[in-house]
Amino acid sequence: MGFHALRPSWRTAIATATVAALAVTTVVVTSGTAQAAGTLPCDIYASGSTPCVAAHSTTRALFGAYNGALYQVRRWSDGATTNVGVLSAGGYANAATQDSFCSGTSCTIVRIYDQTSRHNDLTIAPGGGANPTADQGANAAALPVTAGGHKVYGVYISAGNGYRNNATNGVATGSQPEGMYMVTEGTHVNDRCCFDYGNAETNNMDTGNGDMDAIYFGTLCWFSPCATGPRVAADLENGLFAGGNGSWTANTGRNSAFVTAVLKNNGTSTYAIKDGNAQSGSLATRYNGALPTQSGYRPMTKQGAIILGIGGDNSNGSVGSFFEGVMTSGYPTDATENSVQANIVSVGYSKSVTFPSNGTAYRLTNVASGKVLDAVNCGTANGTQIDQWDSLGNSCQQWRFNNVGANKWTITNVNAGKVLDAVNCGLALGTAVNLWDSLGNTCQQWAVIPAGNGRYELVVENSGMVLDNLNCGTANGNKANLWMWLNNTCQLWSIAP
């Protein structure tokens, strides 16, 4: 689907009821079927006669017997690649492989392996109708979490990141039934199109209603009114359906630290949306009823590609987090999904953000230029521009990080007492940054994202773009701006007192 997409751009850089729905909002409290030791999500789906046809995770095996690679990273320093596998069959990712391989540099996730025998791997997405420029892979070090007591890495999607497979095997097409889930974060969201995982067009274009069937998670409201907060919706192409014909305020969403997002669609008459806290409890059914009555959704016309982090036409302005997800053949039962949720909870996903220190004054040095982030002419007025300059040891080049939420910070210039701001809340590539009075909005909130080797990317919350050294310039006075993530050192900053 396409909406609020980044404008197609080129840059030289060192690189989504006439029939009454049987819909309810209920909390499912049953525990589902009993699980044997070592029984993981795809084993559970298989026992329910709805086997996985795609299974993706950078954190753990999704079959009890799986002992292969989970994902592949590419090293920035020399372009070499390596696979990250599991510690043992049916186990968790061996993050030490990544840490060792990427030591002294940064890495990009370039492939997420399908754990089924169908080889529906995800690779970096090509351009499409909404944005003809190919996407970028995710920063491999950006999302460290704990699962099963082990350090592992999720997939951190910023604006411009996306993965795809247009030539899949066994994924539902036409009106065939399917189910799917993903585990994501309830605090890393925006209102741009489209943080999706699931079934999409095979040509990277919006080809019409019913051609997609993907889980969406975020705050974009396609059919007003919407409940506030991030919600699971069905991206069925040309609409993010919270339930029914689109607007479904009973789908109140979920903003827990980790979220289980569930969607199933029988292809002809019915779909269902569920969510759960991936750390505890059961699934809530947000909608279970008739497919939309608008033209094209009865029956569905799914095409069978798989996308992650983007819309079907490569709309790539969204942000989100991905830890694991599967797609099934057939329409899973509630009991099966309950058992899968219980297994996800057993993983014990957790996350701890300890850097930077709240209120400490830091200097931000661009890795490519060696220059520090600077308020032009030590300005203190609203609108003061931001550039890069040799370190002068003054407070015009010092910044305090003040925590305002889950890895969300305002960045205050020590001399001016004003915060780092995306000018006019811009969404376009190249949006300038300046100093402004604190307004409490997401245009002034930043995520501090590790990139390995003591380097960080700074992601503004409203657009998902990163703080960028304009054209990778090295001269004093070179401006800072916002751009999609490009996997280069011009967008990395060392942060030190």
Question: Which residue ranges define each predicted feature?
Answer:
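Short, hydrophobic/proline-enriched secondary-structure or compact coil segments at domain edges
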Residues: 65-79, 153-155, 181-182, 306-309, ...
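Compact disulfide-stabilized, cysteine-rich extracellular microdomains and processed peptide cores
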Residues: 309-312, 339, 390, 417, ...
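Secretory targeting and sorting signals
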Residues: 2-36
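Acidic glycine-/aspartate-rich tracts in secreted/extracellular proteins
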Residues: 78, 116-118, 187-189, 266-268, ...
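Extracellular glycan-associated modules
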Residues: 30, 39-52, 107, 127-137, ...
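GGW-centered surface loops in extracellular recognition modules
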Residues: 37-132, 181, 346-352, 359-362
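Extracellular glycan-recognition/adhesion modules and their associated mucin-like linkers
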Residues: 354-380, 395-428, 442-474, 489-497
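Residues that flank catalytic or metal-binding motifs in active/ligand-binding sites
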Residues: 67, 108, 151, 176-178, ...
